[in-house]
Amino acid sequence: MSTLITNIAELMTQDAEHRVLKDAAVVIEGERISWIGPSSAAPAADDEVDAGGRALLPGWVDSHTHLIFAGDRTAEFEARMAGESYSAGGIAVTTGATRGTSDFDLTRLALGRVAEAVSQGTTYLETKTGYGLDVENETRSARIASTVADEVTYLGAHLVPAGADADEYTDLVCGPMLAAVRPYVSWADVFCEQGAFNEQQSRRVLQACKDAGMGLRVHGNQLGEGPGVRLAVEFGAASVDHVNYLSAADVEALAGSWSGWQGAGTRGTVATCLPACDLSTRQPLAPGRELLDAGVPIALASNCNPGTSYTSSMAFCVTTAVLQMRLSVHEAVRAATYGGALALRREAGNDVDGERAVGSVAIGHRADLHLLNAPSATHLAYRPGIPLTHAVWRAGVRAR
């Protein structure tokens, strides 16, 4: 089955040449993109969709979410809005609610959140464990996550449970818990922050998970300067997320991890910015402009979670990046598409063949497409808060 999407006013490919095509057309063949070019030269297809002069983008790639949970934390949110500062302790509230919820209901809730994200243009997403915090419930979360998300990350090292010894809990994370979740996950993460896991504990988690053959990610530098960025670069993590508080040495280390990379070769560590979380916690926005200017690739992600960023709107993140972080529209869209793919090692090139590539529109790539109800992507920031998703294709299937 083939589908021709024609009369596209603006096609932001996010391919290697960063091409933006005008009056364009795209052909989907099965799950893949089979043709791109001018509307006037478009081939026939089994089905035809008139884009009506709208803009077409790659689907959003949301590389940082926490979707496996029950309950909410509205009381914590209200307290924070009243002036209380954010700390990681609220994670325990969600852990209690999640442990008390059945597999069926956890799956139902997670699927609802995925559907909400897809309806807004997200076509590829990662999610984490981290609200189980014991072997049984982390394994349960990992298993459920593997049925609802494209990429699953083990975050047993999210918070030390109340009453537990931090080093003994780290032993558990690196031993029995890791062994139990491993069949369901491909990534591992650690919350390297004051009040969560210190440098020594974080190093142990990263080493154990690396030895288990997992890709690495780090929650780092959210609440203050610390060792998170340095550890992420040292261990070759795919991304370090939050990055609100960076020293000059942190920025230099991130930039240095990409030295010599020109779309091929050894990748460095992506800096993943989470602007919706920054606004909700009233933290300084991550320095996306400064990172880009220093040569550090960035990703934008929703950090959808019940405590600090209960949104799946990648468009909101793009809008915030443009209006508050001083990114151009093109830079923000790229960070929310290709940048997310790079943070998940799913960008085209290197060891990723075209059929596995996401975050860009190119022949042979997965047909993840987001049609806006606007003539250009500029409208995402120009008309903030307006729902502009008109149609979505996920792996070639019309999802909206």
UniProtKB/Swiss-Prot annotation:
The protein's name: Imidazolonepropionase
Pathway info: Amino-acid degradation; L-histidine degradation into L-glutamate; N-formimidoyl-L-glutamate from L-histidine: step 3/3
Residues that bind Fe(3+): 64, 66, 219
Compartments, record wording: Cytoplasm
Keywords: Cytoplasm, Histidine metabolism, Hydrolase, Iron, Metal-binding, Zinc
GO molecular function, one term: imidazolonepropionase activity
Encoding gene (name): hutI
GO biological process, one term: L-histidine catabolic process to glutamate and formate
UniProt-listed Enzyme Commission number(s): 3.5.2.7
Residues the record lists as binding Zn(2+): 64, 66, 219
Source species of the chain: Arthrobacter sp. (strain FB24)
